Amino acid sequence: MLRAVLQANKNGVPLHKLQAEYKSVTGEPIPFKDMGFPALDAYLKSIPSVVRIEVSRVGEVTCYAVACKETARIAELVAHQRSSKKKGGHQVNCQMRLKSTAPVSHFGKPKITLRQPGFTPPQEMMIRKPVPTPPWGKGNYFGPRTFEYSPQPIPQLFGVAPMQRHLPNMNRPERKVTLPPRFQREVKSPLLPTPITDSNANHTQSYKRVVIGSGQSDLPVIQNNLKELLNKHSNGLWLSKLPQLYKETYKQDLGGEVLKQVPSWTHICTVQKLVSSGHTEIVIYATTRKQQPSTKNIQNRSNDQAKPNVPVVLSTPSSPPPLQISGSIPKDELKEKISTILTKYSNGLWYHALPKVFEDMFKQKLPIEAFNLDSLTDICTVDLISEEPFKAILYGKSAERAVQNSNPSVNNNIPQKLHDREPPLCSEEPDMTMAPPPLVIPSEASPSVLVVELNSTNDVVIRYIGRDYSAAQERMEDELKDFCSKSSTAQVRPLRVGQLVAAKAEEDAWLRAQISAIEDKKIKVCYVDYGFSETVDITKVCKLGKPFYTLPFQATKCRLAGLEAFCDDSVIIKALEAKACGKILAVEILHKSEKPLVVLYDTSGDDDININAACLKELYDRSLSLQLKANLSFSNVTVTNVCSDGTLFCQVPSKGLAKLYETLQKVDGEFQFQQVTSHLYVSLPFCGKICLYHYKGKWARVEITNVHSSRALDVHFLDSGTIASVKVSELKEIPPPLLRDLISIPPQALKCCLADLPLNIGMWTPDAVLWLRNTVLNCPECSIKVVKIDEAMNMVHIYLFTSNNFPDLERSINRRITNEELLKQKQKDVFLNMSVSSLEKGRGGGGAPASQLFPSGPCISPTSVAKKPDMQQSSPVPSFNMPPALPLPRPGEHMDVFVSVACHPGHFVCQPWQELHKLELVMDEMRLHYSTTEEKPIALEKNKLYAAKIENNWYRVLVKGILTNGLVSVYELDHGRHELVSCRKVQPLIEKFMHLPFQAITSQLAGINCEQWSEETSIVFRNHVEKKPLVALVQTIHESTHPWERRVVAYIVDTTLPDTDIWIHELMTEYLAQFSKPE
């Protein structure tokens, strides 16, 4: 009957609603306690043939039915019974993952805390305490500091979605040792009126009572309703889910002000705060609940970050565990019992939970004299993670190595003492319940992995490469080899399936393995660090000592994004084996879970290859590809795009194009008659993903090429060759019934160039491109004649004709564009960045001579600067008010800054830290605006404001100079950088983007004077401040007419260390003193 209830819900049933659903059909709840199970989820996990349990990204547990023909009829009846009880209204979940933009790389967060004598705040002169390090700011006590960035709060309008971006090989950060969460200090959140909570501890806390407003006349009714809800959901409710559940149950909205007061109603509910990866979530329970949720369930709610598993015993603060002595316990016996407890909790035990665990296990009170850290140090390792002693973690002596493995900052070598131990001690049979700690997913942006093997794209076996992974495994295997070769009690007796052993492999290597089958004198083992199985002789098996349980199993599985629908396709599997198996690849982790969702990249060549996208292309139906040969002619051709370098994209009538139109019509029909739900929207954008975009009343296939932020991304139109920036919310998923049909059609945009014209010469002039676009893009029917096919460049050389000129070569577009009368006033500028001699060395084959393109005369140097603009277009620069000046602190005050550019101590550029999120929003708007606006030739003027496209982003710039080779020198007004860009990438800056003050603050370091800075000094200064969040203490402000000419003289302080402020001017003074000393 349970299967039938679940089958009637195609989208599954949330775990907290399952009892109600079951009872609404059968009239009675699921009797899991009568069957000997303490909780409902434990019973469901015992029947995997009936129920499949999944945990969503937000941590919600959902139950699905496992198919069974026998209950199909019952499921239909249940669905019919439930149809009358369904509540109307559907909600579309369009939440996106927050992504930070690309213009700057932020690492860490500055703290305005100056401890330098003379600048110490009054409150710190009284008492000095270590400055808490934010959970996202990881430090390294043993090496260079690293910084990570926590994005500024983004309005709810833009959704929430963490940044996921693949880093190119050259830009990938070095692997550095960082501290795990248990070494990081707590930080108070100004938004939550709760005490400090450690990031690894999920404690149940009661909030302080909040005064309720007088306008809440129906407050008793709301409180009674909440009592009913909490009693019904005995496993607790997420506070964020409460308004929706309340509205569904009582047909009333739960106001925002009431929701804020709910945690303070201690007479109704008990509050539990769960902290994971710097994010805080709140669960509320009825005050009469008998037991706290298990640690296992809490760990499952940590949805995105796999962490070292520290057991947490939850206890209500209002009833602390008793510490009275019930009887006299000998000291040796007491130590032995505590050691037994710590052995069971191999991953550590909270100090404050020891009395309760002791009483539960031995039915005795823990003597109060034993509840002392000093008396426990001889039997366990005490890890103080904060100044609060009750926040200590206790580890048994045998579990020390497990802690080292889970903490990348601790040396995780297998101890050298292993050789000195007695063989009987090391060869003791480990507890069968003992297991290695879970594998922690690397925190770096783009880690390296070795792809071991695969049977499905949803089960790809990988191994992480790095110091704390593959290198640690190699050290362990060396120790294991020495141990097994010296051990006199090597053989395992008895053998059991599932037992961990050491197995001898090729080349006398000993590897950790798990027994999967036993057959006479042969056993089948799975090498847990490599992910493959092998049958070995029983004599080649050795006991696995306890020290070798400390390193997590290195073989893990992942899922490949974008290939879920073709996970078992033989073509995909074969291509993936050829492109990935046995290779070390870079991986972009989109969703961290037990089996993370990833994108693989091959970075061994000059360009990064997206393995997921490359495998998807193997599904192309080659019969739908256009068959091209030299001298073939095609009519009814449509030119879909003209690029600035003269490259064209054409659609040629073919079988594939007809199939594409037919399939897209079916897509349109699917969207017209299908109800709009959240699964139709792209919720997880990533590079290489194929989806749909509605453009000019029609659906088009697009491939995501770059994800900028939570709102904007770049896409490539597969069938027109166009590249554009679009909003994420405008993308749709391909309907599953049509997914394979659309994926199997090769791209229908044919990349072409005009034959007999110079190739690879840079951009054409605006007039030439504009004439070509007006001539061919608006032509209803064009014709082409294939001259040559360049497979290396993926380019087709063609003669292009308009409708009435085929096949007269003299009237082709190729010849007309080189006609003297076409661009009479600007013949010398038809092509930019090109000399006459290079044209004469262009392609052969009867092309037009260079004299037809350029008049005779000397070649202009590319670097010569024009005194006046050489453009005479009619579009004027718009006139509007300048943005307001950026407010600066007064002398003697300080501000948080981000140093974007650092040349030397006499010149660097800062940005106000608190305003960076506003700048990112403006750049998002600029990207969306200019990507959808047609390029217009403008008359560029020196010292005027424009918008310029630099590396796929649009910036507010000031034109500093105009070169005759088509390049423009610009100054980025928000970042302080000088760049050279093409004149084609400069557009008018509209008033919409002038409200935010220019963010670049030109600065000079105070406290140090030098007329000329050496290159060595500049490098030292740059390494200490560039691309870092710091604190600036303003000394002097030099005002000017224009905001970009203002100059600030300030002290710069690095406050990222817990107890020490680094004053940059002192550091540079010391360096100059050392540098000036005679050798």
Swiss-Prot record:
One protein family per Pfam: OST-HTH
Keyword Cytoplasm: yes
PROSITE patterns: HTH_OST, TUDOR
CDD domains, per the entry: LOTUS_2_TDRD7 (cd09973), LOTUS_3_TDRD7 (cd09974), Tudor_TDRD7_rpt1 (cd20427), Tudor_TDRD7_rpt2 (cd20428), Tudor_TDRD7_rpt3 (cd20429)
Disordered: region residues: 109-132
GO molecular function annotations of the record: mRNA binding
Ranges annotated as spanning the membrane: none
Tudor domain residues: 494-551, 684-741
BP-aspect Gene Ontology terms: lens fiber cell differentiation; lens morphogenesis in camera-type eye; P granule organization; piRNA processing; post-transcriptional regulation of gene expression; spermatogenesis
One GO cellular component term noted in the UniProt record for this chain: P granule
Origin: domain of life: Eukaryota
Protein name, as recorded: Tudor domain-containing protein 7
Species of the source: Xenopus laevis (African clawed frog)
Gene symbol of the encoding locus: tdrd7
